[in-house]
Amino acid sequence: MSQARPATLRVAVLGAGSWGTALAAAASRRHPTVLWARDGAQAQAMAARHENTRYLPGVALPPALQVSADLAQALAHLAHDPAHALIILGVPVAGMTPLCTELAARLPALGLQAVPLVWTCKGFEEQTAHLPHETVQAALGAMPGLAAGVLSGPSFAREVAQGLPVALTVASESSAVRDAVTTALHGAAVRIYASTDVVGVEVGGALKNVIAVACGICDGLALGTNARAALITRGLAEMARFGAALGAQQETFAGLTGLGDLVLTATGELSRNRRVGLEIGAGRKLADILASGMTAEGVRCARAARDRARALNIELPITEAVCAVLFEGLSPMTAVSALLAREARPESPTP
């Protein structure tokens, strides 16, 4: 780290879904932490029961964790010592623009515009095909002193909330962001690695969800572990090609936020993206799966990833196949056959 930070930070986690709650729980074990929930009833129930029954039922939250539905109160927690504070955005991609727009109005008024800020969402914004850092830049880029980055890696929220071991990467051009996240979370069961490759970390986090849907489809069709291994490996090549076109560092894709996150999401039993793929492979329609309440970022961002890749003339055959199955009525087996029928070529895991 570039310089020592104090042992104690004030942390505000904005967004009380499963991942926001898990990170707030981890931070609150060592630092004064406030978790902001947009839903007042949810916040009240969490504060009373020390449990997020909606997103992490059965997981006890640390008694020291404060929960509030008042965004002003959550930010005021930081204003007591803005030089030693951290903001973690725990909302999904779809919630980034509204929240960042609100923060653009609130942070300068409280003197918090230079507080290190990280987001944790993975994917592309459906309407714009923006990666999260582009959304943040559009909403907060004019704010003086902005220091921002992304926190990502192979992690299921439930395990993090339970205090089980996890390794994550914080990526930012700002050493203040990297240092603040490390101070807030590194230690005990959480290991933090630092990077400057924001784009590479985000591309890995976005595309691994799409590849995980493909792996779930493969498993749902009972095509075997050989086929799954091929999808993971060639999916990693797609991630690297896409990242290279956007200026990412290739070594990022061999790390936690590339290969690590892809393997976890493509094979883990807690992976929602894999579960959606399993259902598709078993013959269920996407509309029925979504109507049952199952959600997955891979479904939300697949089309945006495909469209942005096409605009950049990047070949993403697995992503194209997933989109054809999800949105164009192509049968899963036909998609597999089309992938297998592609022309033979030399293996090139990197661009």
From Swiss-Prot:
Pathway it works in: Membrane lipid metabolism; glycerophospholipid metabolism
GO biological process, one term: glycerophospholipid metabolic process
Reported function: Catalyzes the reduction of the glycolytic intermediate dihydroxyacetone phosphate (DHAP) to sn-glycerol 3-phosphate (G3P), the key precursor for phospholipid synthesis.
Family that this chain belongs to: Belongs to the NAD-dependent glycerol-3-phosphate dehydrogenase family.
Organism expressing this protein natively: Bordetella parapertussis (strain 12822 / ATCC BAA-587 / NCTC 13253)
GO molecular function: glycerol-3-phosphate dehydrogenase [NAD(P)+] activity; NAD binding
Cell compartments where the protein resides: Cytoplasm
Taxonomic lineage of the native organism: Bacteria, Pseudomonadati, Pseudomonadota, Betaproteobacteria, Burkholderiales
Gene name tied to this protein: gpsA
Catalysis performed (reactions): sn-glycerol 3-phosphate + NAD(+) = dihydroxyacetone phosphate + NADH + H(+); sn-glycerol 3-phosphate + NADP(+) = dihydroxyacetone phosphate + NADPH + H(+)
Active-site residues per Swiss-Prot or TrEMBL entry: 208 (proton acceptor)
Chain sites annotated for binding NADPH: 18-19, 38, 122, 157, 272, 297
Enzyme class (EC, first level): oxidoreductase
Keyword field: Cytoplasm, Lipid biosynthesis, Lipid metabolism, NAD, NADP, Nucleotide-binding, Oxidoreductase, Phospholipid biosynthesis, Phospholipid metabolism
HAMAP family named among the record's database cross-references: NAD_Glyc3P_dehydrog
A family per Pfam: NAD_Gly3P_dh_C
Primary localization class, coarse: cytoplasm
Enzyme Commission identifier(s): 1.1.1.94
Signal sequence, start to end: none
GO annotations of cellular component type: cytosol
Positions contributing to sn-glycerol 3-phosphate binding: 122, 153, 155, 208, 261, 271-273
Protein name: Glycerol-3-phosphate dehydrogenase [NAD(P)+]
